Amino acid sequence: MSQSSAPAVTDAIYDASSLGRPRMFLLGLQHLFAMFGATVLVPVLTGLSVSATLLFAGLGTLLFHFLSRGKVPAFLGSSFAFIAGYAAIAPNGEAELLPYACLGVACAGLLYPVLAALFRAFGAKRVMRFFPPVVTGPIVISIGLILASSAIANCQTNWLVAVIAVAVIVICNIWGRGMVKIVPILLGVAVSYAVATALGEVDFSGVAAAPWVGLPIVWDSTVFALFGPQFDSGLATTAIITIMPLAFATMIEHIGDISAIGSTCERNYIADPGLHRTLLGDGLATILASFFGAPANTTYGENTGVLALTRVFDPRVIRIAACCAIVLSFCPKFAAVIAAMPACVIGGVSLVLYGMISAVGVRNLIENQVDFQNNRNVLVAALVLVLSLGIAYSTAGAIVLELGGVTISLSGLAVGSLVGIVLNAILPGNDFEFDVSELEEAAE
């Protein structure tokens, strides 16, 4: 008598209901673990709420799936690209300044719907001429290099623990297999945290005092905390001008991520549901998260790795992971464990992460074969790098302007990004052609 065989491991599964609910739940947990290390590290680095981060990572993912018609198996986690913006406006996570940083990120999120509308109206090819790799590459490189000093400062509290964190991440990433290779950050944090605990570097008093169940939102860190007599319009303007340009780099990253997910799943998400829908979903998720004191959201490459490993491409599995993140956000005890993470652990992991941010910028230049024998390209890239880094590491750390009685501080990244975009637009010889067909072919 013939029997129906179960799907082979190498077979792509687009309807996970055939696996049964228990296995779907386990697959969802796997995606949760994949995004976990990087997602919870961002609030630790910026001073934002870990619980709010998990809540709006889950809600943002569900919103993204709704706006993209539930077709793209993408998880939205915390974006590292905006850490430099938080550091510029609210250094060391100063509580009274975090709402201004969140306002800047929310305004950056507004650029996503604008770009989505432009993509819809004019097509990606025309719009992307203003954001070629010769501009976005150096911006991304600058983000990582500007953050490097904070990573070193954290490592100096205990270099042994920091080096262990780096070593675990490198070993897992290079020689790991299966899920070990996909979650190196999570494993690096776990191992170095355990070593730091053994060395007496961790204070668990906050964990003992934290309740098991509680609300995840810290209202003093939200944009709503700005509505009062203490509102500083100059600082708000500074935050917006400083952080908004970072959105251009993250939007380029988004396009690459959607292409990679499509290639992995053998589906053309560039065409259906379309970049205008995925950008809109990502942008609105970022705006929602920022208003309530959580980091900006972005599509996660770690979850793309899980898709490639499991060959289960059902978006419902990602939505299970999102729901698990939401449930976990209501446990302050868990958030306290993350908040107790010592600086040396954060520093070790940050060394790798910030370096990878800059390396992504370099890869962007190489993959797009930017011609640096062309003086035009050299000038654009040089000014972006020197202005971004030079101003950031100057004594003032920013350019201070007085406009109509309002004091505005422009960070190095803001100045470098704006100068790069303007120079690219006005200098002759802009021959960059955004090849939509290549993205579509990769997804087909």
Feature-to-residue mapping (PLM):
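Membrane-embedded alpha-helical modules
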Residues: E96-G206, A322-S437
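Membrane-embedded helical hairpins/re-entrant loop segments and their flanking transmembrane helices
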Residues: I13-P22, V44-H65, K71, T242-P315, ...
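Short, non-helical or kinked segments that cap or interrupt transmembrane helices
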Residues: L48-T53, G70-F82, V127-T136, K181-L186, ...
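Interfacial segments of multi-pass membrane proteins
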Residues: Y86-G93, N173, N303-I318, C324-S329
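Intrinsically disordered, low-complexity non-transmembrane regions of multi-pass membrane transporters
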Residues: M1-L26, F204-G228, S263-I270, A425-E444
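Juxtamembrane interface elements at the cytosolic ends of transmembrane helices
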Residues: P7-V9, F36-T39, A165-C172, V183, ...
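Hydrophobic, membrane-embedded alpha-helices of multi-pass small-molecule transporters
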Residues: P22-A38, V161-A165, V183-P184, L215-D257, ...
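N-terminal signal-anchor module of multipass membrane proteins
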Residues: M1-L76, A81-A95
